[in-house]
A protein has these predicted regions:
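Active-site ligand-binding patch in enzyme domains
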Residues: 2-144, 156-159
C-alpha cells in the first residue's frame, strides 16, 4: 500500500430514510440524544472536525465534546471568503482546547486574515478560484500532524469529499 499523505476522513451525517439531511424549512435536527452521544464519542477519536461556513452561519456551534474525557482537537472551517462572524462560538469557545483553523482561498483580503489571526485562528489559504482546494487542504492538514478528521457537513461539503 502506498504512503498517502492525507488524513483519514470519517463522514458523520444524520439523514432520513429517503436521504434528506434537513427538512424543506431547513430544520436539520434529525438526531436524538443517543445519536449525539455517539457523535461526541467519535469526536474523541479524531484529530480534527471539519464543517462548512454555512453550518457556522446557521447554527453557531461550539464544535466541542460533551459526555467524554478528551484532549481536544482542531476545529476546521471551510470558508472561502472568511465570511463567518469573528465572534462565532467556534472561535471564542475554549480556543486553547479546540484551536480553530479556517480554510479560505488565496483571493481573500489580507486584512480579513489578520483579523482572524489576531484571535489566534490559523488561516490556511489555498485555491485560486472561488472555492478552497480540498486536495491541497488535506496535504496541509497532514503536514500539521492531523491524521484523522471527522467531516460533519453540511451537505455541500459532504459531497465535495
Amino acid at each position: 500500500m502506498k504512503n498517502i499523505k492525507k488524513p483519514y476522513v470519517i463522514l458523520n451525517a444524520a439523514m432520513t430514510i429517503d436521504g434528506k439531511i434537513s427538512s424543506k424549512e431547513g430544520d436539520s435536527e434529525i438526531s436524538d440524544e443517543e445519536d449525539w452521544k455517539e457523535v461526541h464519542k467519535l469526536r474523541t477519536q479524531v484529530d480534527a472536525i471539519i464543517v462548512g461556513k454555512n453550518t457556522i452561519l446557521k447554527d453557531n456551534p461550539k464544535l466541542h465534546i460533551k459526555f467524554y474525557e478528551h484532549n481536544g482537537y482542531y476545529r476546521i472551517i471551510i470558508d472561502s471568503k472568511l465570511s463567518i462572524p469573528i465572534d462565532s462560538q467556534v472561535i471564542t469557545y475554549k480556543p486553547e482546547t479546540y484551536p480553530t483553523i479556517i480554510c479560505a482561498t488565496e483571493n481573500v483580503l489580507q486584512e480579513k486574515v489578520q483579523e482572524f489571526e489576531a484571535r489566534n485562528v490559523k488561516v490556511i489559504k489555498n485555491g485560486k478560484s472561488s472555492s478552497v482546494d480540498l486536495k491541497k487542504l488535506m496535504l496541509n492538514l497532514y503536514n500539521l500532524g492531523i491524521r484523522s478528521v471527522l467531516l460533519e457537513g453540511g451537505g455541500n461539503l459532504n459531497w465535495s469529499f
